[in-house]
Curated annotation (Swiss-Prot):
Family to which the UniProt record says this protein belongs: Belongs to the MOZART2 family.
Subunit organization: Associates with the gamma-tubulin ring complex (gTuRC) consisting of TUBGCP2, TUBGCP3, TUBGCP4, TUBGCP5 and TUBGCP6 and gamma-tubulin TUBG1 or TUBG2; within the complex, interacts with TUBGCP2; the interaction plays a role in gTuRC activation.
Gly residues compositional bias, start-end: 110-119
Name of the protein in its database record: Mitotic-spindle organizing protein 2
Predominant cellular place of this UniProt entry's protein: cytoplasm
Region (Disordered) location: 81-158
Functional description taken from the UniProt entry: Required for the recruitment and the assembly of the gamma-tubulin ring complex (gTuRC) at the centrosome. The gTuRC regulates the minus-end nucleation of alpha-beta tubulin heterodimers that grow into microtubule protafilaments, a critical step in centrosome duplication and spindle formation.
Cell compartment(s), UniProt: Cytoplasm, Cytoskeleton, Microtubule organizing center, Centrosome; Cytoplasm, Cytoskeleton, Spindle
Sequence positions bearing Phosphoserine: S34, S152
InterPro entries per UniProt: MOZART2
Amino acid sequence: MAAAGAGPGPGPGAPPGLEAALQKLALRRKKVLSAEEMELFELAQAAGGAMDPDVFKILVDLLKLNVAPLAVFQMLKSMCAGQRVASDSQDPTAAPLPTPSVPETRGRNKGGGALGGGPALAERGGRDGPGQRMPRQPSASRLPKGGGPGRSPPRSGT
């Protein structure tokens, strides 16, 4: 029941359940990424993307769950902007940059606080564009097909 590689933490007086949980956690931390994910992680590092393997695993899991890559990117961008504001609060030129984007996204997009990259594009493309065009396109494409069994298009009589 001695600490077998558990590292600094609970000593030999720790309950066996806690020690087993710590060992499982240590094993999980050692193998966070699968072989394919590790290869992708190494490629990302080679491309200059320095990131913790746990964070990379979260990103890969989000993409596996079919979360839109643009949404993941914009969420990371907004999170990094928040960190930049906190860390660069002494620099007067860095603080005004992220602050105008926060009220813009809240004012224009009612539910899209996380999407801070392009509120005008999301407003035009998401609400006005496809929202009005999509019902018109299928109805126009159905007319030449005949409309149903036994019916003929109106121009067939000529």
